[in-house]
Amino acid sequence: MTERLSLAEARSIAIAAAGFDRPRPAKPGLSHARAVIHRLGLIQLDFVNVLLPAHYQVLFSRLGPYHRRLLDHLVYRRREFTEQWAHEASIIPVAMWPLLRHRMAEHRARPWGFDRVMEEHADWVATVLDEVRARGPLEAASIEHPGVTASCFDHAWFRSVPRAVLEAYFGRGLLAIAHRHENMARFYDLAERVIPAEHLARQVDPAGARRELIRIAARALGIATIADLADYFRMFVRDAHRPVAELAAAGEIIPVRVEGWREPAWLAAGAKPAKRLTAAALLSPFDPLIWFRPRIERLFGFEHRFEIFTPAEKRRWGVYVLPFLMGDRLVARVDLKSDRTARRLCVLASWKEDGIHVPVVAEALAAELRTLAAWLDLEKVTVARKGDFARQLAAAVRGAAPCAPNHPTALARAPENESSTPPPSVPPSCIRSPSASRRKDR
């Protein structure tokens, strides 16, 4: 008989699997950063610097203030991790390189249409690899431009032909990223000079690789539909059916039904609800817990869109919006920007979710904003008037202290379609009645 889980149990399992089931360490070090990446299986790279590059935020959400060089040291000095296309451009354990080789063999050059340009200039393209072999590691600016122009660059986020060629070789696994400049520019080198020989030589057939990727995804997600599992490594759902069936037959994932979910779900063996969830964390738009919109809506009833590329007049929430996780709920969202010249963390807009205990959430969010600002070497948090949470948050920011590890529940009432019995992370006495919520928080 298929096991049934409440939505609260599923949410607790997912949050725990994502690494929010324990307090932040007092002094985050290499071992903590390493453990987060291994637990998640990958961290998506994104260098949009409205707030800070997103991959650093993913670690901060779980570890609190840490030295950002820890991540760079693990990837580019110790080379325990490396860059490759996984869930988009990502940081992955070097041991995962063989699991992605079948995708490297199928890699298409970017921007779309650049394959044809490479074919038309094959002789010059070959010299780029020769240059890296002779002089690497090299950045794109070190490669002489061939004078080639192509319409495929018209809407690309980079327009360098040498960069596109280096990226094509990287995507195909011939090159790897040796290190990055302070301005984030990549330095490319031959894969055999970056990836340890034991991983470079390991051969994994495509079916075995897909099975292992789904296994990693299942562990990182805790509970997931087949679409959730496939999305983790940007796999077609049709390619996920066989590895899911094999892992189920081996008892590594278990079929379950979740309250309110139309599709069947898969529970990673050993995954279970956390005994207590005390997280208070702002989540990057590229955090694995929230990057797949259908899953975040199923788990949290939270509608989330990344609107940085949306025309201003069509944006609902803002340019760079981070949800705020508190306990087992997403209770608010803020549109953030780092003003490095004025040394301010700017809250451009702030919005609360329905049914929250407003003073408690405002206090916790204000504390987290203060902690984030200090970590970014910003002196002040400012809150603009936009959003239905702005007034309460601004008042809390004025009196905020550093974030405490534990705080009462954010809920003012039980959400719709769920049992009124609180999950293990929520003391029953902290849940307020709907009438009290209307009297004091509205």
Feature map (PLM): residue ranges:
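Long, charged, low-complexity, helical-prone intrinsically disordered regions
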Residues: M1-A412, N417, C430, R438-R442
